[in-house]
Amino acid sequence: MRRILLLASLLSLSASSLIAQQQPTRPPITGVAFARFYTTNPDAAERFYGTTLGFERKQADGMWLYPVNQSQWIELITKTPPPRADNRLAAVAFTTTDAQQLEHYLESKGIKPEQPLKKGQFGVRDPEGNLVIFVQKGSEKPVATAPASPNATSTRIIHVGFMVTDQAKEDAFWKGILGFRPYWHGGPKPDVDNWVSIQVPDGTDWLEYMLNNGPNPTLQHAGVMDHFSLGVVSMPETVVALARNHCEGANCTKSQIGRDGKVQLNLYDPDMTRVEFMEFAPTQEPCCSPFTGKHPTAGDENK
């Protein structure tokens, strides 16, 4: 009887080990790849992204692409009207070292791709319906051979952000399944979080939850919340670059220190989508919580 029980135990352990070996593991997710938005005024959008921000436009799959570097870019949907009048965000995207393995890993967690793997990328929906695209590192991305723009006001996307209603549900996906890590959290009041930043598991870029938005946010409010951030070394130098690109309006020179201690400057595209210039490192102690991760730099672009 003891031999039978011992044999059964060994068989059970072997089966458990085999199942564990067969379970897909999550490959590295290294940073932000792109942010995609709708525009209802392509000509004005070109003046903003092309002239004011200084990025040179390319086209692929019916969209406008503005390379920030050879692995990060901004996408604009110009031919399809936004599905909602109060929102312009279409997708956020992150780079992975193995898109196929990540797709299998997410399927093993019950998350089916809405856009199956094709041309080095696939897309899923997070718990609140945001389209999240994962891009294969080293794939033939349209920006991979793009030369640096001489008028570019930044060469790094450091984070993307969007409105979140249920933080616990989002955490289960972004932190629990994808492995994103806490970076910083805070808000206008020290004891209430309006912004929660979580870094990619294998890099320094981050996703920012924008909390406490109320039941019916307007397009203007959504434009502030659903945003992307361009990293810069020096905000005064950025202001000079914007002036050189003929940036018009008070916002072109209006920098401030955020609650996280980093200098920032906000501009808005013709559809009221916010572009946040932000210095890579804080210049003073942050409010509300300490940073718990490494800050991005100009030289660690997501490749």
Description of each model-found segment:
Residues 5-17:
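Bacterial N-terminal signal peptides
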Residues 38, 93-95, 163, 229-231:
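Short hydrophobic/aromatic beta-strand micro-patches
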Residues 21-27, 103-156, 161-162, 183-200, ...:
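Vicinal oxygen chelate
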Residues 27, 33-74, 108, 120-123, ...:
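Core segments of cupin and vicinal oxygen chelate
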Residues 45-47, 99-105, 235-242:
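Short amphipathic alpha-helices within nucleic acid-binding modules
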Residues 68-109:
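Mid-chain, structured segments of secreted extracytoplasmic proteins
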Residues 30-34, 71, 87-91, 155-159, ...:
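Short, solvent-exposed beta-strand edge segments and adjacent coil->beta transition regions
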